[in-house]
């Protein structure tokens, strides 16, 4: 999926954070945004994944303007692991990861065997399958981050937005994450790993 930003501008309290940012990422392209703390990297990503609406400019997913799409439509195309995840879920790990399947469901549609298979595969990918029945709130910060990544993988989108995804991860799991997205194997989450 191609993600395009055109002339994105965002300001807070009379301070211009983003000034005319334009970029394009092509299908299956791995893109990194670098810069010092406070330079607007997360602000740009929040515009891309709909948390912020830019003061000016637009974001396009495969040529379609993001804010003209329904939230469900954009969630079928793009999953997000945000920099800060403040969740106090009283759900099991498996239930949290199942939330990633929501964009593919009709209202009140029940989870099926395929959903559980996708969730189990996502948990295995992030090495959290042994925690499937644990309550999310009992996990460490790094374990929670891996569950949120599994939820994004279970969403099975063609784009995955990661904002400082190694936050809270120990070095072993930082390396695992980097290998997951830089290995020569297909990164299409719709294919089995």
PLM feature spans:
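The feature captures the beta-strand-to-loop junction immediately N-terminal to the Walker
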Residues: 34-36
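Helix-to-loop junction immediately C-terminal to a conserved catalytic motif
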Residues: 49
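Conserved ABC transporter NBD signature motif
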Residues: 57-65, 74
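Conserved ABC ATPase "signature" region
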Residues: 98, 113-131, 156
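Conserved ABC ATPase signature
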Residues: 109-110, 135-139, 143
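Catalytic Walker B motif of ABC-type/P-loop ATPase nucleotide-binding domains
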Residues: 160-164
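Conserved small/polar residues in nucleotide/adenosyl-binding loops
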Residues: 181-186
